[in-house]
């Protein structure tokens, strides 16, 4: 196993522990707590994949960070902060909408790269909106936290979420996954639109009907994909 992979996991475990202590003092806002919960799942998945104990890794990560901080000067810290572009966290969904449990009458699931797509194919003839919470950097979607499909009544009928054991995805991965989700929902004569925020940063465009610019050929392909492969 690559030593950098192990040490990266150890540092991530320790930094999560620090953030958890911060949250335990009721100092974190909603986006902070949301990322904390998501990162916990990711660490568990990575730990299982690597065969590493999280508690042991956290202690090792603490030692690594202590060595780094001993050598860190205030001037170096200022330069590092200035050179790192800042990302923004955008929310279409409330914390309740993100954490709410939901159930599918006709569950369908597809894994696309590091993203998991889930659809309730019992849903027909509904108006559906896709909402997402995600981070943005350089005015482009950076990391998807969670995307969910809602009916006008507020019921959850679809979802795209990162797989904890396979961290890392691009904005193109997200757009392709959204295409699969839309195709699956439209296969049952549902009308799907995407939130304006998601359109703006995933496609850098906004349509009046809330429809991302997927060509008809891709739409038919996505519908067949969700029908045959899920």
UniProtKB/Swiss-Prot annotation:
Gene Ontology annotations of biological process type: symbiont-mediated suppression of host cytoplasmic pattern recognition receptor signaling pathway via inhibition of RIG-I activity; symbiont-mediated suppression of host gene expression; symbiont-mediated suppression of host mRNA processing; symbiont-mediated suppression of host PKR/eIFalpha signaling; symbiont-mediated suppression of host type I interferon-mediated signaling pathway
Lineage top rank: taxon: Viruses
Motif mapping: Nuclear localization signal: 34-38
Protein keywords: Eukaryotic host gene expression shutoff by virus, Host cytoplasm, Host gene expression shutoff by virus, Host mRNA suppression by virus, Host nucleus, Host-virus interaction, Inhibition of host innate immune response by virus, Inhibition of host interferon signaling pathway by virus, Inhibition of host PKR by virus, Inhibition of host pre-mRNA processing by virus, Inhibition of host RIG-I by virus, Inhibition of host RLR pathway by virus, Interferon antiviral system evasion, RNA-binding, Ubl conjugation, Viral immunoevasion
Compartments, record wording: Host nucleus; Host cytoplasm
Primary localization class, coarse: host cell
Region annotation (CPSF4-binding) ranges: 180-215
GO function terms (MF aspect): protein serine/threonine kinase inhibitor activity; RNA binding
Entry keyword annotation includes Zinc: no
Residue ranges, annotated region (RNA-binding and homodimerization): 1-73
GO cellular component assignments: host cell cytoplasm; host cell nucleus
Motif mapping: Nuclear export signal: 137-146
Described function: Inhibits post-transcriptional processing of cellular pre-mRNA, by binding and inhibiting two cellular proteins that are required for the 3'-end processing of cellular pre-mRNAs: the 30 kDa cleavage and polyadenylation specificity factor/CPSF4 and the poly(A)-binding protein 2/PABPN1. In turn, unprocessed 3' end pre-mRNAs accumulate in the host nucleus and are no longer exported to the cytoplasm. Cellular protein synthesis is thereby shut off very early after virus infection.
Sequence similarity: Belongs to the influenza A viruses NS1 family.
Entry text on domains: The dsRNA-binding region is required for suppression of RNA silencing.
Protein name: Non-structural protein 1
The species this protein was found in: Influenza A virus (strain A/Mallard/Ohio/556/1987 H5N9)
């Amino acid at each position: 196993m690559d030593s950098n992979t192990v040490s990266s996991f150890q540092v991530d475990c320790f930094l999560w522990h620090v953030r958890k202590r911060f949250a335990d003092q009721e100092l974190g806002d909603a986006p902070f707590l949301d990322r904390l919960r998501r990162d916990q799942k990711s660490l568990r998945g990575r730990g299982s994949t690597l065969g590493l104990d999280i508690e042991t890794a956290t202690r090792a990560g603490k030692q690594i960070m202590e060595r780094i901080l001993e050598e860190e000067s205030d001037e170096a810290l200022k330069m590092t902060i200035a050179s790192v572009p800042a990302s923004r966290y955008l929310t279409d969904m409330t914390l309740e909408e993100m954490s709410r449990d939901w159930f599918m009458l006709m569950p369908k699931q597809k894994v696309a790269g590091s993203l998991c797509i889930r659809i309730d194919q019992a849903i027909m003839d509904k108006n559906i909106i896709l909402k997402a919470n995600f981070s943005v950097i350089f005015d482009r979607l950076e990391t998807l936290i969670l995307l969910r499909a809602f009916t006008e009544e507020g019921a959850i009928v679809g979802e795209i979420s990162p797989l904890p054991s396979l961290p890392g995805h691009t904005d193109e991965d997200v757009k392709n996954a959204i295409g699969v989700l839309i195709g699956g929902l439209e296969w049952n004569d549902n009308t799907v639109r995407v939130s304006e925020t998601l359109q703006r940063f995933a496609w850098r465009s906004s349509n009046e009907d809330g429809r991302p610019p997927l060509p008809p050929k891709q739409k038919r392909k996505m519908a067949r994909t969700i029908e045959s492969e899920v």
